[in-house]
Amino acid sequence: MLAAARLRISYPAGSDEDGNSWEALDEMRPLSALTADPADLVRLLDWGPGKGMEFSERARPAQEVIAAAPIRAVHATAQLREVMTQFWHDHFNVASGKDESTAAFFPAYDAMLRGHAFGNFRTMLGDVARSPAMLYYLNNADSAASPA
């Protein structure tokens, strides 16, 4: 069902503040971020000098998760799992559009919630609290205890 799904990505040619440029794009792509290794998606965060990338490319992983939700809801054989996954997304909300850091980790966050849909709540809560998507969303990615 998801293997045949495509999502449009479209943006004009442009450049960033460092002068890195990109060509205009308008194409239909498969939902490849859903099964991508999170380490591969981290490259979307490395967009410094010499690595110009349009924002739509960095936001793409989260957009794919959002696009996949209704497809799974309609076509999944385990529809109750989809309902519970959406419930946990609503309960442990991570605004995927907050920034590109959250977006890059959103497919892994979705997979984690999906895996815990009917599991142990305490285990899921621990995984949510340590999730890179949640840490970026809460601005806790670089948080550390004071040496007091």
Task: Kindly give the residue locations of the regions a language model identified.
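A contiguous strand-loop segment
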Residues: 1-148
